[in-house]
Design a protein with these regions (language model features):
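Sec-dependent bacterial lipoprotein signal peptides
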Residues: 1-24
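Aromatic- and Gly/Pro-enriched helix-to-coil junctions and flexible linker segments
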Residues: 25-44, 48-76, 82-89, 96-249
Length: 249
């Protein structure tokens, strides 16, 4: 007597399912194709609006750059093109070495050494080499004052805004992000009213520069030590160049 064909099909399906599930449970050796290396470099595409780029003076530049953990010198970088403020820029970095750990918008010196990070994107550990890394940074203030404000006045290493804020108005000075510019530029110094804190065009005559570069007898806390560290030392120059260049916002 012939078996019902439906039964045969069902039995086949059942056997196949059991065999497949046993096999896949036991098998720990299957390579995940997502992590397969297909190339030996990344391509990166950064989109964003970069404001106040043209306020930079001196030998520093703002660049899209890639870094690894070991060095402050970029593996590869492209200086942002000086262009009109309200145009969205698309920057491309190709042949980025696969040991790159971050894609950054950073202030760099002429030797491609990182002076300050303004934006950082950590490359995911499972990033596929064959795919372009696409990053949208939105609108970023990359100007000279914007960089000083972000890296020094709000920085966690210098802590200016921790001692100088509306809540803790030491020397009646508010260095929080939204107030730093107006608290400094053309504002008379509390501890030496004969001077402005920042006198545009004249760093040597500005109280801010005196306090951070050599100190002042009327200021009961030495700020010079905040800028001796390698990380912050370049900002003595940058702040001087910013003031001498007209202290633009
Ligand atoms: C640990 C607290 C502390 C930190 C951090 C700090 N300051 Fe001060 N700052 C002071 C004190 C205290 C004074 C002097 C107040 C006094 O003598 O009455 C002062 C005074 C000043 C003055 C003089 C203001 C005036 O009008 O007389 C400036 C400028 C200044 N600080 C800038 C900075 C900057 C820039 C930073 C960060 C790089 C900073 N401070 C970090 C405590 C601090």
């Amino acid at each position: 007597m012939m078996k019902h064909p439906y039964r045969i099909i069902m039995r086949t399906v059942l056997c196949a399912t059991v065999a497949w599930s046993m096999c896949s449970c036991d098998d720990g050796h299957v390579d995940d194709p997502v992590f397969e290396n297909t190339e030996d470099s990344y391509n990166v595409e950064i989109t964003g609006k970069f404001q106040s780029l043209n306020t930079w003076r001196g030998t520093y530049s703002v660049a899209a750059a890639c870094f690894n953990d070991e060095s402050n010198y970029s593996l590869i970088q492209k200086v942002l093109p000086s262009s009109t403020e309200d145009t969205v820029q698309v920057l491309k970095l190709s042949n980025v070495p696969t040991n790159a750990k971050t894609v950054e918008i950073a202030v760099t010196n002429t030797l491609r050494k990182r002076i300050a990070t303004l934006y950082s994107y950590p490359i995911p550990y499972n990033q596929r080499y064959s795919d372009t890394i696409k990053i949208d940074v939105g609108t970023l203030n990359v100007g000279m004052f914007g960089s000083i404000n972000q890296f020094i006045f709000q920085g966690t290493g210098t802590n200016c805004a921790r001692c100088h804020s509306a809540e803790r108005p030491t020397a009646n000075l508010d260095l929080t992000a939204a107030h730093a510019y107006n608290s400094l530029v053309n504002a008379p110094a509390e501890k030496d009213p004969s001077k402005l804190r920042v006198k545009p065009g004249d760093a040597e005559g500005s109280f801010l520069y005196k306090v951070i570069s050599e100190g002042d007898e009327n200021v009961g806390y030495s700020h010079v030590g905040l800028f001796t560290d390698d990380t912050y030392a370049p900002f003595l120059d940058i702040i001087k160049a910013w003031i001498d260049g007209g202290a633009k916002e």
